[in-house]
Amino acid sequence: MAQPSVILATASYDHSIKFWEAKSGRCYRTLQHTESHINRLEITPDKRFLAAAGNPHIRLFDINSNSNHPVISYDSHTSNVMAVGFHCDGNWMYSGSEDGTVRIWDLRTATCQREYESRAAVNTVVLHPNQKELISGDQNGNIRVWDLAANSCSCELVPEVDTAVRSLTVMWDGSMVVAANNRGTCYVWRLLKGTQTITCFEPLHKLQAHDGYILKCLLSPEFCDPNRYLATASSDHTVKIWNVDGFKLEKTLVGHQRWVWDCVFSVDGAYLITASSDTTARLWTMSTGEAIRVYTSHHKPVVCCALHDGAESAPS
């Protein structure tokens, strides 16, 4: 099976994963995932595999195969897996779960190499661009930095007591982190390096972005320069685009009829893919804020999406 240059996948409460031709909107492959719903999708840096985080397993599927069966399964979590991602060289994977743990996995052997206790359901985990720290957010409102070299929590803060942190995003150069919560608020910090290379948070901005929940926040990628943006997807059916310079509202993306659960930028920041409870995913052009493609084939809420339209990153 020939690999397309652009990998776009969506997952839905209809227990399926679908692969799409991004430009035409044609669905060319459907994977059945009957054992549970899927909370998060992530594509490996080399574009060979797709990780699907469910309850309580993570399944790894071969993108270039016609098989419905996963090539490997990661099985140590005991509840919903809400976050999944990869080290830049593709050798290991990280995850966060409602069982209160953050885990690191050997991608090839499926063994859990490390486990960090968050003491509350983990909703979101991101890898710092330095590839040496994980940042997690949980249901109790805690944000923790996990130092992978020291194998411990190096920093902990609570932006808003008893308000769940739904989503975290880190600027591509490691200069900024944003946390979004259940009250529609984004907290922004400048990331500073201490004398012992421990990441420190300097408060930068508080943004009341939505009246409803923020389900995903995402900073634009490196090649989006000179402008840098923050996208916030919400239960109010909209996605808002904020200019990081002053956090001025640039655009509101209107078109979805239900909650917007997930979003992902194209590698150049010119486009945004969104996933919604209205059973569709959409492709938006950032220059106009218009939806130029609607992906329709799911018959229940679409809760996550993954896009890889950049060059392959070969494993080391």
Curated annotation (Swiss-Prot):
GO terms for biological process: regulation of actin cytoskeleton organization; TOR signaling. The keyword Signal does not apply. The keyword Repeat applies. InterPro entries: G-protein_beta_WD-40_rep, MLST8, Quinoprotein_ADH-like_sf, WD40/YVTN_repeat-like_dom_sf, WD40_repeat_CS, WD40_rpt. WD repeats lie at residues 1-32, 33-71, 76-115, 117-156, 160-199, 209-252, 255-296. It comes from the Eukaryota. One of its GO terms (cellular component) is TORC2 complex. Keywords: Developmental protein, Growth regulation, Repeat, WD repeat. Belongs to the WD repeat LST8 family. Component of TORC1 complex, which is an essential cell growth regulator that controls plant development. Acts by activating transcription, protein synthesis and ribosome biogenesis, and inhibiting mRNA degradation and autophagy. The target of rapamycin complex 1 (TORC1) is composed of at least RAPTOR, LST8 and TOR. This is Target of rapamycin complex subunit LST8. The lineage of its organism: Eukaryota, Viridiplantae, Streptophyta, Embryophyta, Tracheophyta.
